[in-house]
């Protein structure tokens, strides 16, 4: 007999797969029927036309319940799907600015930045310098400080402005809501 695979270990044992001499039985209505022999529990399950499912194999004696195993698996998969649906993937959006970004463009980008943060995404702000603009990095810092001030109510600075080559980078993440 080969060792059970991971898939077999994940599934609960049912009916004849339960080999222990006695089990703690929970009936169809969810009431405790006490500790009974496995044969008796199987007979009770067959009389009700349902399966005997081992719920807690590590308990002494193991806890078994009379239920429809197919329905049990379906409910379990529904719960897992619901849990997966509730998980939110956090994306990192990127907005690019220049030290010469005009006010109209700044307002449009700020609106997009706030929208991204409200959706729960992080935003990486890249401020790129070209040519002789590198001599005036204070203009870039002013833009980043202005962005930080304008988004103070919805964002937290996750990574403060730092220089990488010809760019300044800053990462904002949404404020935690209670």
Swiss-Prot record:
Biological processes, Gene Ontology terms: ribosome disassembly
Pfam families: IF3_C, IF3_N
PROSITE patterns the record matches: IF3 (PS00938)
Major location (coarse): cytoplasm
Cellular localisation: Cytoplasm
Entry keyword set: Cytoplasm, Initiation factor, Protein biosynthesis
GO molecular function, one term: ribosome binding
Gene Ontology CC entries for this record: cytosol; membrane
Coiled-coil stretches noted in the UniProt entry, renumbered to this chain: none
HAMAP family recorded: IF_3 (MF_00080)
Free-text function comment from the UniProt entry: IF-3 binds to the 30S ribosomal subunit and shifts the equilibrium between 70S ribosomes and their 50S and 30S subunits in favor of the free subunits, thus enhancing the availability of 30S subunits on which protein synthesis initiation begins.
Assembly, per entry: Monomer.
Family statement: Belongs to the IF-3 family.
Protein name (database record): Translation initiation factor IF-3
Organism: Legionella pneumophila (strain Paris)
Primary gene name: infC
């Amino acid at each position: 007999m080969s060792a059970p695979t991971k898939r077999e270990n994940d599934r609960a044992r049912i009916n004849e797969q339960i080999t222990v001499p006695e089990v703690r039985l929970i009936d169809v209505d969810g009431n405790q029927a006490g500790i009974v022999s496995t044969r008796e529990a199987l007979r009770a399950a067959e009389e009700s036309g349902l399966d005997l499912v081992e719920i807690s194999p590590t308990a002494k004696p193991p806890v078994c319940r009379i239920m429809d195993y197919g329905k049990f698996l379906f409910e379990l998969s529904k719960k897992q799907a619901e849990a997966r649906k509730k998980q939110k993937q956090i994306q990192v959006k990127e907005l690019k600015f220049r030290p010469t970004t005009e006010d109209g463009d700044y307002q449009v980008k700020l609106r997009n930045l706030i929208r991204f943060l409200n959706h729960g995404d992080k935003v990486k702000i890249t401020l790129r310098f070209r040519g002789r603009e590198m001599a005036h990095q204070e203009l870039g810092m002013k833009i980043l400080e202005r962005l930080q001030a304008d988004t103070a109510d919805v964002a937290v600075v996750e990574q403060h402005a730092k220089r990488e080559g010809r760019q300044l980078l800053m990462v904002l993440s949404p404020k935690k809501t209670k």
